[in-house]
Amino acid sequence: CTQTFYASLMADTYAEIAQTYPDAKADLLTQVSMFDTLYATSNVTIVPAHTDEGYGDAIIAWTKQKEKKRTFAVYVAELYARGLLPQSVMSVFVKTVADDLLECVRHTKVAQTEEHVDCLVRFMFAVASRVPEVKVHIRAVLSIPKAETPCLNMKSKFKLEDALKL
């Protein structure tokens, strides 16, 4: 949560840097290209049963990964709001997440897919107030009957509904 708190400050700082050093904007586009790797289906940490020997380490890894993804989403939304990310880049991010979300919510319920869906939902929520086109995609997901969305748990569904209010 601390990292997301600083996202707007970091975006403001980057905007100042980009004014002085125009190449910084191009560097930023390279930096945000980690999006595909960060939100890849294979990049999901699952928490084992609390009786598992590696439970403590897994909880730490899971928390760090979740925070990294949440912070990235808030940061790109702040960068976009300041004109540092072009509409085309943000649209690609939103479309990629929305398409993945539409597909994954329909998958058979397994821990990895449900966790991935939660991360995608959190991305949509983080950018919803800055990127209005997100809401069309959210409505599309929410319009799918519950019986057809085994990987969309109630917590994620409520998060999407909350995003529509932003």
Question: Predicted regions span which residues?
Answer:
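Alpha-helical interaction scaffolds
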Residues: C1-L166
